[in-house]
Each structure stands twice: as structure tokens, then as C-alpha cells.
Amino acid sequence: ETSPEYDGNLLSELNALYEGGDSFNNIKSQFLPKRPIEKSELVSSTHYDLRLESAFYTNYAAGIVDWFSAKVVEGNPRIIVGDNISDLSKAYWESLNHNADGCGNPLVTLCRWAAREIIINSRAYWCIKFNEENSIDGRLSLFDAITVDDWQKDVDNGVQWIRRHTVDTIRDEEKPWSAATKELHFWTFYDNEKIIIYTASRDVGKNWNKKDIAIKTFEQYHEFGNPVFDIRSDESMWVMDRIKEPAIKLFQREANLNFYLDNVTIQVPYLNLNDPESWKSLPMTPLGAIVLGLNEKFGYASPSSAGFEPSFKSIELCKRSFYESLQIMAKEAAALPQAGRLSGEAVESMQKPMEILLGSFAWPIQDALERSIASLKEYRTEPDADIRVVGFGKIEADETELEELIFGQGVVNGAETKEGGEGGEETTDD
């Protein structure tokens, strides 16, 4: 069982729209439904299969998400350490700036990942981990929304406990070059007292059955308190959920246009002969030649491009929906009281609606980070240490940058449509 608030299918779709590539192609049919005529028994399934195969996903969503994420951290979030602690302790706190997770990733990178996660999935979690037993030098880790599938909140709306579900694949030890044959599933519980891990395995592609039992493989008690801190993003600022429908509709429109461009806009050779019946006696050999008479001509004809104008305009309207959805979100963010949760410096510097929208992603990350640091200070018996998080108060952005990002000067926006006559466009050799 998962939390009633957890929607794994929705999160999978949102992540596929962001990631593109194989993640998108594996569920592409969910985004390109069959037309009523394609469901009929009178129409071959080949038509839909060809349309699906030719459908290409232009990943506008990833550009938006990555631009937002980069803007959130352009002030270079970092930890500032005062002088009221020992040199050894100061070295530890400052080390988090360039190696926040113990794997070499700096704090600004983790903050950018956190911004990306709440923009796509609306929630994320900081987790404090200790790489060595009895160590007090904790490191930060980021948990994404799709793996945290169950949780309970306390009376203060904080995290009481969470369950994280992750999967590893296992290859045959005797055939390490072969594809993975087993899935190893881990369910990790985090609460105020302990960390417990349950494990189970199954064949790749198989479902669980009643005989499958998860076995407790790890249990560790600790005195840190709950090491997980939720990044509390406002659900009304869930960007990827807001632009999901425009992204899907844009994909469908582009897929339909590409299919017909590939299959309809083919130049067809033709002969314009004086005697309509003379074509019956024309030689058909690879080395043959046709001598045209007076007023006869040979050429190529193709459909008029004017017929595709509605499709191009529809694509432009879908891209406009992207832009307008985000514009509305920016204006909503500027009107919400959450803008006051930013520091005085940030409120003063962020005046434009787009800047305030980006600030609405910055403050939850900073807030969760400060709660994490406060717990670490208590655990290290340094409650009065002057440790501050800075760098979230400088964001400069406006709608013009977003407009350029979405529309750019691509084929659809910059191409000029050349209309032909009733008979289409043609080139001839008289």
C-alpha cells in the first residue's frame, strides 16, 4: 500500500515528459491516443502503428524546467560559517559547500536538483546521512518524490516517518555480460528512532504474488531524530502538472503534422500530353527516354502547403498555452502571501512576477535546508554556532526570457509558408 496522496502513474508521466528519450518512448502510446476511425475494425491497425512510430517528441518542458532550476540557484546558495566555533568544526561546515553529499557534489548542485524535483513533482526531501558509524559529520542526500511512496505527518505538519522504495537490478553471476534477470526491491523506513530496510526480489518483468515476502535486512537505532526533512512546496505552484496538458497537446499536434508531412508531401512525377490516350503506348524501361511533343511537358507536383497552415497555427497556439500558463502562475505567485516568507533582501530584490514565482521554489529549499542544519547543530552539540544559508535571495528573470525560451526562432515560428494554387506547387521541364 502507498499513501493516498501518492500517484505513481502521474509522477511517471510527468518525469517522462521531462526526461524524453526512452522514458517517453516507453509510454508514448499513452500520450498519442487512437482516433475513433483507427479503433474501427474496418481500418487496419497499421495506420496507428505508423503514426505512433513516426511521432517525435520535442522536449519543450525540459527546457522550461531546467531554466527555472538554474534561475533558482543563480545566486550560488552556500553555507556561511561564523567565528564562534572551532577550526575543525568550521572546516566541516564549509566542506558542505563543495562536497555536500559525500560524493563530491557541491551544495549548489543539490539545491538545483531539489528545485528541479519540486518543479516537476511538487515535493522532495533532504536526508541527513552519516557515512561512518558514530560520526557527527552528516552529509546531505536528496530523495525524489517518486521513490517516497508512503509517509505520515506530525501535528506540526512535519515528517513523522517516510517509506522509500528503490529497485536495483541483478545480473546472473555466471553471465555478467547478460541482461539483468532479477529485481531487488528495498523498502526503507525513516523515523525519529531508527532506520529499517526490508528487501524482496523477483524476476524482471514479473508481478508480485501472495507467496512473496519482504524480509527485514537492516535495522539501526539512532539518536539524531528523524533525518528526513520535507521540502514543502505549494501545490498551486506545481509547474509540471500545470503544463502537462499543453505539453501533451503540443506533442499530438506535432506528431500529426510530421506524419502527414512524411506521407503526403511527396513530389509525384507527371506528364502533360496532347493525346490523353498516348500514355498507354509509352515505353517503360530503366534506360528508356520520352520525347515530348510541342506543348507537352513533364514535371513534379506536390500538395499545396496552404493545407498545412492550420496545423502550424495549432502548434503555435499550443506553445502559446505553455507561455500563458506560466504567466498566470507568476501572477498567482506574486499575489500569494508566501512571497513574504522570503528574506527582506529577497523581497526587495524580487519585484517582477516571474522572479517571485522562482522565489516560491527557492524559499522551501532554503527552509528545509535550514531545518536540516539546525538538527545537525543540535546533534553536534553546537546549537549556538553561527551557521547561515545564503544565496537564495538573488533571482533576476522576466517573461521576455521565458518567451524566448519557448518560442525561439525555430522552424514553426520562423518559417514562411509559401502557398500554391489549386493544383498545388509544381516544377516542370518544358
Predicted region positions:
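Short secondary-structure junctions and interdomain/linker hinges
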Residues: 21, 71, 75, 99-108, ...
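A general structural signal for short secondary-structure junctions and capping/turn motifs
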Residues: 115-119, 175-178, 187-188, 258-261, ...
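Leucine-centric amphipathic alpha-helical interface motifs
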Residues: 1-27, 271-274, 411-413, 417-430
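Extended, charged amphipathic alpha-helical segments
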Residues: 207-344
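C-terminal helix-loop subdomains that flank or include functional centers
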Residues: 281-289, 296, 310, 317-430
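Short amphipathic alpha-helical segments
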Residues: 88, 92, 106-110, 242, ...
